[in-house]
């Protein structure tokens, strides 16, 4: 009983400090129990950066390579569970089973109602957590949404996934939806919203190697704006590059990923994932490099933290990164930086912490397609 009271009081203190403008510390409820943890990274009272550093220091190089793939294996000797990036959540999660379906993104944007859109994002985030409760290994909380591609051409077959041709409206609606997905807790993330597709992605024909030509003014005043809005407002915590090239360089290798997205907009606790089969596409589609070792090395250097390729089969990713290490194209330090970004997000989801500290761990399958969410869907339609 006293333990529960301490947790409640200390949790309230974290919320008060956050409201006062302080960076919320890790929930301090477990601080007096630090000796109970086998490793420091398991201690919720420590700052994220210290937990990440401790965890990385305990991984072998082989384990680090394995954790660079979308389907990250468990590391049983350290008590690290398996983790999967990527749950589609554009306007619901009905692809996982019976769930609430909200109007397509294009229709939602026409409401011009930030509050309503945030409510919808929150409902979808709840249902993501509900499916995660049913099967944590299959249903991850890293959501690949919202889509903030600007709708330049009505002939594009994916226009219904985006919000508008207007960068301001797209940025505001994306921020509202991602804020709902993220949740309102000062530390824990309900889900990890990941914006896509960066950058200038507006065609399906030859999308794997076509190049979008953009002058500097249009780049900064138009194409980058919706991404900047959602990321700088701390609504989104992830980014996915597009398949296409921009000015003849594959978007997955864009220098903007590091120089602009990570360093100027995002700050701490942010990661970049590739689109499916895009890493191997650097060689197979773009023909930009002649080996997967070179392609993966340059992708890591550009800012890619996690590789989505070959479905659940990590062999290509592991072989390419292992070869890149042997050839001196990347170092273990490069992998550490990428994994630090990924694990900073994983710690924010609460997967390493006691359930009583994370309010979103209480969301079960009861929230999926609930009457409350059905009414919200009806209102939004």
Q: What are these model-predicted stretches?
A:
Residues 19-381:
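Glycoside hydrolase catalytic-domain context in secreted enzymes
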Residues 8-18:
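Bacterial N-terminal signal peptides
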Residues 1-6:
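Positively charged n-region of N-terminal signal peptides that target proteins for export
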